[in-house]
Amino acid sequence: MDGAVRGQGCVGRLRSFNKTKKKNRNCSDDMRNGDDEEKKYSHHDMKNNLRNDANEEKRKSSDDMRDGDFEEKKKCSRHDMKKNLRNDANEEKRKSSDDMRDGDDEEKKCSRQDMKKNLRNDADEEKRKSSDDMRDGDDEEKKKRSRHDMKKNSRNDADEEKRKRKRKCSDDLKKSVVNDASKEATSHSDWRKNRKAGSDAEQRGKKLLNGDKKAKSRKVTTPFFEKMRKIKMQRTSNQNGEKNMKSDGDSYKKTVPLSVNKGKMEKDGTNKRTLSNTLVAKERKMRPSDSMEMKMKKKKRDASFVQPDERTAQTFSTKNKEKKRKAPSTPLKREQKERVASSDNKKETKKACIVAIGNEKKNCRDGKKKKRKAAFAFFKFVRDEFEELLFIPPAVAPSLKDLIDRHVYLEDSEGKCSKIRLSVVDGSLAFYEGWNSFVSEHCIKWGEFLLFEYTPESTFSVRVFGIDSCERLHFSVKSGGKGAVKKRKERHTLSDDLISHYNGQYQDSEDIHDGPNVSGESPRSKEPKITVDAEIGTRNLVAKSINAASETQDSERVESGIGYGSLGALGNKVRNLSNGECDTRSDSVFCIQEKTRRSEVIIISDEAYSTQVDEDTMKQTAPSEASEIHHVTINTQKDLERVVDGVCCESSVALNNKMGNLILGEPKNKNISPACSTEKTNGSEITPTTGVIPLTQENIDTVKLNTLSCFEEDRSTTRESELAAAIPTTSETHDSDKDLGQKHQRNSVQVNSIIAVDKYPNDSEMNISGNIFRIYEAPAGTRCLEKWKRGIVNGRAALDDIGQVRPEKTQKAGEKLVGNCGAMGESPVDLRIESDVTDTCLKPILNIPIEELSILDSVSISKCGRSRTEVNHLFNQKGATVQLQTKKEPLKPTGSSGNRKGDKIAVSVNRVFAHQSELQIPQQENGNFTSCVTPVALLPAKAELLDLDDHSLQFCIPSTIQKWLELPKSLPITCRQKGRYDRNVVILKDPMRRLWPVFYHDKPVFVGFTAGWKPFAAANNLQAGDVCKFVKEMDEDELAFQVYITRK
């Protein structure tokens, strides 16, 4: 029961449980439904809440953002404000800096403008101040510009010639290309017709290309012409190919075009060398380019290898045979022919080449055509300094650039030629070497007009027009004709005795006037002779200078017989004399003709010609009392020596290092010893007025005085009429001599001459050489120098001990002569010394030959007055000095003695050599001279010019020679002569008398020479240790210094 109950209970429980379960299910459904609704509502609320919350959050965040943005904006605004403030400050600073800069720029601009103005003003001031001083510099700049222009013109001419040649070559090439193209077309057609005969064509091609046995011609390697040739040939081949393409068809395609390279042809399968008869091989061998090149080569050879004879025949041939012109025969051609005939080594080598023109063969000379210049003309007026050179106009100079440093020929109206060298002097082209001889031969004077016409082969035709505007067809001085000798003999005929004496001595020698004597082309002779013609009178003495030129135109000497002049050698060739028709040669005869009441003729003969007299004898003859002719024969021992003659203060030029004796006097038909001779004639005792006493020694250590003289020509035409005038008395002669001396003071020249030591116990006369014009009263009568001619000594010496000499500068009246003149005063010294006719003695004049060299330091003449004269000679040799002192008792001057300053006159003698310890000086005892050996003490002496310390500067060249030279002290230049205080242009005269403009600076930092010093040092070969001495020349017009150089 319990179990049932229990079972029932379980069931009930289950039922209740199920019921409860159903209830719960229903409740749960209800709850679910309610929950669903609630959930729906809660979901909606939750969404709304969420939205609200989100909105609220957004609002809050937006508010927060707004607050943050505001704060950030505030911060940003503050930052921007700061930035703006900074930018504003920076902008203000920039503006202020820009303003400051602008102000500084304006100030700088103002300062720059002021500086530029100041610089311009300073530059203008310097230009104004240095314009006068820099004239030489401006001339040099002009010369440089002219050189630059000449170079430009020459370059332009060369470029123009090159262009013309290129144009001609291109035109010839075009013509040849056209002709070759036409010939090529015909050759192509013929070749196609005959292509079966390949071997024959090959042989013909080989003959065409190589000739018979000639090497293949080279191809034109110029890329421009090669390209042009290919283009032309391609065009012509294309034109011809279009015409022949229709007929030939496939055969044309087999040919190789011109533009095919060798590499492309070699890429073919077959070997072209083995297939000699193939079309390709034939085409290669018969290419038109090769044939065209051969033809071009032939044409060029034809143009270049035409014989000159055929050329002249072609150019000068006309229809009329009479009008045929031959090539002119000029001196240059003749000289070239002689040169080729004389030397086998200078023969022109000719190369013969055979040029095939059709079937003919011509032999041609290998060389270029000689260009012939067209004839042109120019004229020149003869102005100052025309004796040495003549400048050619700059416009004409470029056309003569090929003749620079070559010889040309000047042909005058008489058909005579002179050989002259064209040289560049100071940047300009000029007639230089040989021009002086041309001037002297044709007597060209200042103011005349010369017309030059250039003809081919370096020849100029010269026409001379005088001052009267008329052409001079004949010239007074002729170079080697018989007519000139006849004219000379008509004017100055010698007496019968003199002619017989002359003919007797020289009858075996050839006539010295017969051969032609052209300047520069001297004929060779077996026996050289020198003859000098001059006319000397008691009133007038004309000493003509000799202006001659040797074969090389290097050596020229000045000769004069009596008067103030010199006797010297002119070289080993025949020379032309300016005073008449004479030929001068070395080792020769000096003949001086005189036509006067009492005239003297000095004949210096060679030992070979003089057989009638001894070495030391003098032969004098007098044909009549009215006209006495004195012959003095002097043996020169085959070489004329430096002879010092005392007649009218003469000097001489040495020919060699041997001694010659000259003694002149007036006894009749007597032989007089060279030492001394006195005789009574017509109640008076007459002694030779001139003598030369040699100074000898056992070892022949002797002293030699070097003398040079230059002459100034007096252009007065009244001198010629005085030659034929009557001879006045002695008093009249003195008056005329005084007037003549006053006239010659205007045209005086500095002269280097001998200081003659004269010693007279009987108060007679003393001869002092060194002045340009002197008048003496001698026993034979007063001899005065009347007419001088400038002796232009140009070039090197032909013989020993003769250096190059240039003419001195002409001194004006009132100028002081310093350096190589005889006296220092306001005018040249004019000494007129009187001697008693009844008692005269031989004047001892030193003739000193040379063995070893040294330099004369100074020669002074102190107390040159009427009461006493001292002559001191100081010779310096390696620290030793030879001092010769001669004292003289009162003199008797009869004329003006010249102006002197103070009691001393300083004399400078250039190039005096000394080496002797004992001198042999003759002395007079009882009317006869005896020679005695007088020892001369070697005393130390300073090398300086006396009384010229304020006008000289001596220094030693430094160890290094540069473009500039620093001087130990300032040069003696007065402020009045300066163009500017600190710098100036100074003229330096070297020992050869050449002028050198040099820039001189005188500043606290530097004193010395800059521009111009280097060429001066190079030309004079200055070395370290040489001593230079600058002596100021007393010339107010320019700053000039004579430079004496002592080698170390």
From Swiss-Prot:
GO cellular component, one term: nucleus
GO molecular function terms noted in the UniProt entry: DNA binding
Biased composition (Basic and acidic residues): 26-134, 151-162, 169-214, 243-253, 281-295, 332-345
Gene3D superfamilies in alphabetical order: DNA-binding pseudobarrel domain (2.40.330.10)
UniProt keyword terms in alphabetical order: DNA-binding, Nucleus, Repeat, Transcription, Transcription regulation
PROSITE patterns in the record: B3
UniProt subcellular location: Nucleus
Residue ranges of the region described as Disordered: 1-345, 505-528
Entry keyword annotation includes NAD: no
Biased composition (Basic residues): 16-25
DNA-binding region per UniProt: 375-468, 953-1048
InterPro entries, A to Z: B3_DNA-bd, DNA-bd_pseudobarrel_sf, REM16-like
Keyword Transferase: no
PANTHER family reported in the protein's UniProt record: B3 DOMAIN-CONTAINING PROTEIN OS11G0197600-RELATED, B3 DOMAIN-CONTAINING PROTEIN REM16
Protein name as catalogued: B3 domain-containing protein Os02g0598200
Organism: Oryza sativa subsp. japonica (Rice)
Lineage of source species: Eukaryota, Viridiplantae, Streptophyta, Embryophyta, Tracheophyta
